Amino acid sequence: MTSERDLLDACRFPPAGTAVDLAVSGGPDSLGLALLARAHGLLVTLHHVDHHARLASGQDAAFVAGLARDWGVDVVVHDVHVAPGANFEARARAARRAVLPVAALTGHTLDDLAETMLLNLVRGAGLDGLSPMVGDPTKPLLAVRRRDLAEYVVARGYVARQDETNLDARYRRNRMRHEVLPLLDDVAERDVAPLLARAAQLIYDERRWIAEATAHDETLSLFEADCRELAAWPTARLRRWLRARLARDDPDGTHPPESAEVERALGVVRGEAVATELAGGRRLARRHQHLSLE
């Protein structure tokens, strides 16, 4: 089993004595986060989001409240109501973000990073989607393996809550976790998650350099730009600018632009199409050398 010291060395926590908010569902990842944060000397406040989507959700909330009571720390239970159905994961994620403190730390692990990278890849994401979560200070456990975290929780004498929906094959992430990644391990004859995490870090480093080189582009709004000038840009630069602009103008943040949408938007800028439909019922059009988003 990985020692507590080795786990702490892999974490990217703020200095000991810092007051932090933790998002704690009661599952092994977030419980491991809370235990390690306290072992590191952080002053924690626990935040639990009750989606009221599972029969056991009230028990999860009571479990987290009990942890806070035993540890003598503050806890905040956020009640949200997310109805089961289509796009549940995205809607639940948006609901959590709406109520949790912006800087709340989460228990995302290296395995979550690998899964998200692959999910974004098959969704058609660009460079940003291929380096998800990297560099995010609210995700201090991205170098920690999920299995090591679960073993640590047990070794500390805790029994984490289990969410049965994490085994539901209707959710794409679960299939990526339980079917695709094990198959990739078998085909590659090695553990591929660390390789994916390493690739994500390399892509993130490239993104940072590109962002610095194109920082001035960020000041140009979608509606002020002249399409004739945009069309003269290198394709990679224009593609990056369009992706950023479309993401910024997504009203609820639940429809990040896919690669196919960005490519169609390129065609609009270059005059190859008058307009194109985007996710979320939006429409990008070109009129008199300028763009509009409806």
What are the language-model segments listed below?
Residues 100-103, 184, 214, 293:
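Enrichment for repetitive, rod-forming helical segments
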Residues 40, 71, 187, 249-253, ...:
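Solvent-exposed amphipathic alpha-helical surface segments
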Residues 1-182:
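Core alpha/beta nucleotide-donor-binding catalytic domains of modification enzymes
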Residues 2-29, 45-51, 80-82, 178, ...:
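AMP-forming adenylation/ATP pyrophosphatase catalytic core
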